């Protein structure tokens, strides 16, 4: 029996410069679930090729909100790329929702998108297609290999920081300048 280290739900996972996998290089993921069976998160700084207007249209949801239609949908990760994930700050009882922690929620049901289209959705929301997943012990191994940093989730990083700045800003919240780190890591 292994003992699970502190669960990482509601943490930001920040790729270190040495992580060369193109899917995760310079990425920031919000860890939404983490237990002895593995972890699930959503990348929050990878734009997809889609706008929210295109996604809503494909779902048969109309909106007149031009800003909402132009919102970039994130590429949340390589797992279930056809599935939508909404990270937001609205505690309402959506059909399929999980409290990630400290006023941050993950919803996968259509009702939140319908509310957003009607102008009745969360004040702050990120919409992503796909997520990232780690098998049992995989994330812990990658952390031990110095592929990632962790930092507490931060609404400012999630909702008020430009996509292209989230990687550096998330690390800066814990005092790390990623541009001063080498691409090599080791163990003492």
From Swiss-Prot:
Superkingdom, natural source: Bacteria
Q: Spell out the InterPro entries in the cross-references.
A: AlgH-like
Q: Which Pfam families match?
A: DUF179
**Listed GO cellular component terms?**
cytosol
Which HAMAP family does the entry link to?
UPF0301
PANTHER family membership: UNCHARACTERIZED PROTEIN YQGE, UPF0301 PROTEIN YQGE
Provide the family line. Answer: Belongs to the UPF0301 (AlgH) family.
For this entry, the protein name equals UPF0301 protein XAC2918
Instruction: Look up and give the organism this protein is from.
Output: Xanthomonas axonopodis pv. citri (strain 306)
């Amino acid at each position: 029996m292994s003992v699970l280290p502190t669960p990482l739900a509601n943490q930001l996972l920040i790729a270190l410069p040495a992580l060369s996998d193109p899917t995760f290089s310079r990425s920031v993921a919000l860890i939404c679930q983490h237990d002895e069976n593995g972890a699930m998160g959503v990348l929050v700084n990878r734009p997809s090729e889609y706008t929210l207007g295109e996604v809503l249209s494909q779902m048969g949801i109309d909106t007149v909100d031009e800003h909402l239609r132009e919102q970039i949908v994130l590429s949340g990760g390589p797992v279930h790329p056809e599935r939508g994930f909404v990270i937001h700050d609205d505690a309402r009882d959506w059909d399929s929702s999980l409290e990630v922690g400290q006023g941050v929620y993950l919803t996968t049901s259509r009702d939140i998108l319908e509310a957003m289209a009607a102008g009745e959705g969360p004040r702050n929301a990120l919409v992503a297609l796909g997520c990232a997943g780690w098998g049992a012990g995989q994330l812990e191994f990658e952390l031990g290999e110095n592929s990632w940093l962790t930092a507490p989730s931060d609404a400012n990083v999630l909702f008020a920081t430009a996509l292209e700045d989230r990687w550096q800003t998330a690390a800066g919240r814990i005092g790390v300048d990623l541009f001063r780190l080498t691409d090599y890591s080791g163990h003492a």
